[in-house]
Amino acid sequence: MSTIEERVKKIVAEQLGVKEEEVTNSASFVEDLGADSLDTVELVMALEEEFETEIPDEQAEKITTVQEAIDYINAHAQ
């Protein structure tokens, strides 16, 4: 079983079409990984599905880096 960090990074790489080695913890989805607003919405949906959790819109807007996604999932996933 992969760690949450590994699973988040894999999803980010798949959703944004970047190499996994480009997905660092400090990487910004928009500035570093080239995501647009639609990409970020799809990314949040993929994270919700993978981790069977709901990410409210107001929380999703605050998740702008890989580490913030990891932290949110660690705090809220089942």
From Swiss-Prot:
Keyword RNA-binding attached: no
Record GO terms (molecular function): acyl binding; acyl carrier activity
Pathway where it operates: Lipid metabolism; fatty acid biosynthesis
GO annotation, cellular component aspect: cytosol; membrane
SUPFAM superfamilies with a match to the protein in the record: ACP-like (SSF47336)
Key words, A-Z: Cytoplasm, Fatty acid biosynthesis, Fatty acid metabolism, Lipid biosynthesis, Lipid metabolism, Phosphopantetheine, Phosphoprotein
PTM summary: 4'-phosphopantetheine is transferred from CoA to a specific serine of apo-ACP by AcpS. This modification is essential for activity because fatty acids are bound in thioester linkage to the sulfhydryl of the prosthetic group.
UniProt KW Lipid biosynthesis keyword: yes
Location of O-(pantetheine 4'-phosphoryl)serine modifications: S37
A Pfam match: PP-binding
Subcellular compartments: Cytoplasm
InterPro entries named among the record's database cross-references: ACP, ACP-like_sf, PP-bd_ACP, Ppantetheine_attach_site
Residues in Carrier domain copies: 2-77
Gene3D superfamilies from the UniProt entry: ACP-like
GO biological process: lipid A biosynthetic process
Family according to the record: Belongs to the acyl carrier protein (ACP) family.
Function: Carrier of the growing fatty acid chain in fatty acid biosynthesis.
Protein name: Acyl carrier protein
